[in-house]
Amino acid sequence: MKLIPDDNWRWYFDADQARLMLDLANGMTFRSRFSATMLTPDAFNPSDFCVEDAALFFTYQEKCLTLNIDAQAKAELVLNALVANRFLKPLMPKSWHFAALGHGEYCPQLGELVWVRLNERLEDACFMVVDTGDKASLCLLAQAELALSGKVMVLGEAIKIMHDRLCPVDEGADHAQSSLHFAHAG
C-alpha cells in the first residue's frame, strides 16, 4: 500500500500508549517511535497534517527510494522523520560514536541519505537527515539496526551528528556499499 497524504490526516497524542499518532483517515493509524519525554509541547495538542508536513513527506519519501528496505519500513522511516522534524525536542550531538571523515564544510540537505563510520569497529551505517543545523544535523537510522556502544539502535531512531562525521551516500556508495545495502537500478 502506498501512502498519499490528504486533508483528513490528523496528528494526536495517545496518552495510553504515550506516543504521538497520525490518523491516516482510512482506518489506519501510525504510531511514532518517540516517547512522550522526547516530544515538544506542540505534540500533545491535536493538529491537522498541514501543507508543510505533506511537502516534507514527499521530500523524505523521494530520498529513501534507493534504500533496500521494504515498503512498510520506508513508510515507517518517512513518518518518523516527519515526527522528528516537527515534534522532537532538540538533541545534543553524539558524534563521538563516529569517525571524523574530513569533509570540511559539508552541510547535508534535508532528507539526504548519509553514511558514517563507527569508531568502535570498522563498520559504516546509513542515516537520513531530517533536520539540518549549522554544524550538526538530526538524523534517523535508515537501516534495520545498528549496534552502538552496547545499545542497539533500530530503524527510525534519532541521533544528532556533527557534519564532519557525515558523508553523502552518493559520494561514498562504492566505499560503503557492503554495509549500506542500497537498491540498484538496472
Swiss-Prot record:
The keyword Isomerase does not apply. GO terms for biological process: division septum assembly; FtsZ-dependent cytokinesis. Its main location: cytoplasm. Coiled coil: none annotated. GO terms for cellular component: cytoplasm. Keywords: Cell cycle, Cell division, Cytoplasm, Septation. It comes from the Bacteria. It is found in: Cytoplasm. Belongs to the ZapC family. Interacts directly with FtsZ. HAMAP family: ZapC. Contributes to the efficiency of the cell division process by stabilizing the polymeric form of the cell division protein FtsZ. Acts by promoting interactions between FtsZ protofilaments and suppressing the GTPase activity of FtsZ. This is Cell division protein ZapC.
